[in-house]
């Protein structure tokens, strides 16, 4: 099957405003997500080229390091294909090669966390899309992954955190993983913490990173096919965010494609996957007037073709589109689109 090419530039405008009351310093950051790294390369993940995950993650780190203007990196979940010690150690070592600070939130693949009323790694949990115990009992827990990345946003046993980062902004990491489920959830305790945290930083620009989406980005998000890509109580989370006008952007990564929209004066940006076609990472720039997101491809041509073929063979992603060439084109247009998106930003008035 030949590779289908697509590229779009989208400009989205918000209500016009004058100089922001809250300082909005110019900042550039990268978003690395969905690397599905496996040290052995032998884990099956829907549509992902796991066998080349090490090469792709290394290329992402090298590309970020080659850029002089990147302030920090957000690792937006599903770093691992499967939670196992060697993969975790190697992934951490590769991220430690970054020359700028990096901050981590977890995805549902990043550690074993069986839900209540289900045995660890039960068939029921596995069917629900959650992580399962590895053969022979091998594997690492979410708490182990959290402790591995202490100091990279994470501080203590919780998966949510807040950090002041140069050049003078605040980054908030949310833990949207709902153990044993593919979809996300933010519980009442974390919501209360989020509200209080945003109030404490009301005079600073805030960027939020989470794994699961908080707004629908495609009609399929509102049906059974893709509803698991979102936080199941996303409305409650947005209600908290919209009380705090200093929140400029929410970055997520569970959709695996580059996309975004504006809701309640906040830019909701979805970043592509490193190991699912188009095998890319996001480079995001924010200044006083606008936010720009560009995805940066990582795969050489032969690997990119293989990745696209795997995407088009995926029941979860390609299977929801009509059969035939029109369906192929629609799938590729979605996953390979939004090469660059620009959002006009409003005045921030706490």
Roles of regions detected by a PLM:
Residues 26-42, 168-178, 209, 267-272, ...:
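Active-site-proximal beta-strand elements of phosphoester/diester hydrolases
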Residues 34, 77-78, 107-108, 174, ...:
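Active-site glycine-centered loops adjacent to acidic/histidine catalytic or metal-binding residues
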Residues 18-88:
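N-terminal active-site segment of His-dependent metallophosphoesterases
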Residues 85-195, 236, 262-270, 279-285, ...:
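Extended active-site neighborhood of metal-dependent phosphoesterases/phosphodiesterases
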């Amino acid at each position: 099957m030949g590779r289908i090419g697509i590229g779009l530039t989208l400009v989205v405008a918000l209500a016009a405003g004058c100089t922001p009351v809250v300082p909005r310093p110019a900042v550039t950051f990268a978003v690395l997500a969905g690397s599905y790294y496996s040290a052995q390369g032998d884990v099956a993940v829907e549509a992902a080229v796991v066998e080349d995950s090490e090469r792709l993650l290394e290329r992402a780190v090298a590309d970020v390091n080659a850029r002089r203007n990147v302030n920090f990196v957000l690792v937006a979940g599903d770093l691992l294909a499967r939670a196992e010690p060697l993969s975790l150690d190697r992934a951490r070592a590769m991220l430690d090669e970054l020359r700028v600070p990096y901050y981590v939130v977890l995805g549902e693949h990043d550690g074993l966390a069986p839900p209540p009323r289900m045995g660890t790694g039960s068939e029921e949990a596995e069917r629900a899309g959650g992580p399962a115990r590895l053969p022979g009992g091998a594997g690492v827990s979410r708490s182990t992954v959290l402790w591995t990345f202490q100091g990279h946003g994470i501080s203590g046993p919780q998966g949510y955190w807040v950090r002041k980062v140069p050049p003078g902004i605040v980054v908030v990491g949310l833990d949207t993983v709902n153990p044993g489920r593919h979809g996300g959830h933010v519980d009442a305790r974390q919501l209360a913490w989020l509200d209080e945290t945003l109030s404490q930083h009301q005079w600073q620009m805030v960027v939020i990173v989470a794994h699961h989406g908080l707004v629908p980005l495609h009609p399929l998000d509102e049906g059974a096919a893709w509803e698991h890509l979102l936080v199941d109580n996303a409305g409650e989370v947005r209600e908290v965010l919209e009380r705090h006008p200093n929140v400029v952007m929410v970055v997520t990564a569970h959709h695996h494609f580059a996309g975004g929209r504006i809701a309640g004066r906040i830019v909701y940006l979805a970043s592509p996957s490193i190991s699912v076609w188009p095998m890319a990472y996001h480079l995001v720039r924010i200044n006083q007037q606008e936010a720009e997101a560009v995805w940066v491809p990582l795969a050489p041509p032969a690997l990119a073709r293989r990745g696209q073929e795997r995407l088009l063979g995926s029941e979860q992603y390609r299977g929801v589109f009509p059969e035939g060439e029109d369906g192929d084109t629609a799938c590729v247009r979605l996953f390979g689109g939004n090469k660059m998106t620009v959002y006009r930003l409003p005045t921030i008035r706490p």
